[in-house]
Regions:
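C-terminal/domain-edge helix-coil "capping" segments
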Residues: 1, 82-122
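A structural "domain/chain start" motif
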Residues: 1-27, 31
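A short, hydrophobic beta-strand-centered structural micro-motif
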Residues: 2-8, 28, 35-36, 40-70
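Beta-strand elements of well-folded, non-transmembrane domains
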Residues: 12-14, 61-65, 77-81
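Intrinsic disorder/low-complexity segments enriched in polar/charged and small flexible residues
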Residues: 21, 56-58, 89
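Short, low-complexity, polar/charged sequence segments that are solvent-exposed and flexible
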Residues: 26-31, 76-78, 94
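A generic structural signal for well-ordered alpha-helical segments enriched in polar/charged residues
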Residues: 31, 35, 116-119
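An acidic-aromatic pocket/loop used at catalytic or ligand-binding sites
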Residues: 67-87
Length: 122
């Protein structure tokens, strides 16, 4: 299954300064897509039959009383299709991780997980 087009979608559910490099994350992911010869898409919803995907990057984290950032992040390539009028989500690649990051944030961790996902894309 070849990906021809993709759009980066960021979902920021982090509080307390646990994820602050959204622009850097988007640019890094878009560069990785270009390096894999995947075109930047322009669609409302990616259609599987057209080999369109969202590169969905989500961080859910909060700062603890001790000052750590605790939460999870999910990086995945997803698309959608309809069969007999029902919508289905197709996940091509996915990385779901949780972390407790002492006295810092999810910034570098997010970039590392995006890199891991791209290492799996052939």
């Amino acid at each position: 299954m070849k990906i021809t087009k993709s759009m980066v979608y960021l979902q920021d559910n982090a509080t307390g300064g646990c994820w602050t490099n959204l622009k850097e994350t988007r640019e890094y992911a878009e560069d990785k897509l270009r390096m894999k010869n995947i075109q930047q898409g322009d669609f409302d919803v990616p259609e599987f039959v057209n080999n369109e995907f969202w590169l969905w990057i989500e961080v859910r984290a909060a700062r603890t009383v001790a000052g750590n950032c605790s939460g999870l992040m999910n990086v995945r390539l997803i698309s959608f299709t309809t069969i007999n009028g029902q919508w289905y989500t197709i996940v091509r690649n996915s990385k779901l991780t949780s972390a407790l990051i002492p006295s810092n944030n999810f910034n570098n961790y997010t970039l590392d997980v995006v890199k891991e996902l791209f290492n799996e894309i052939k």
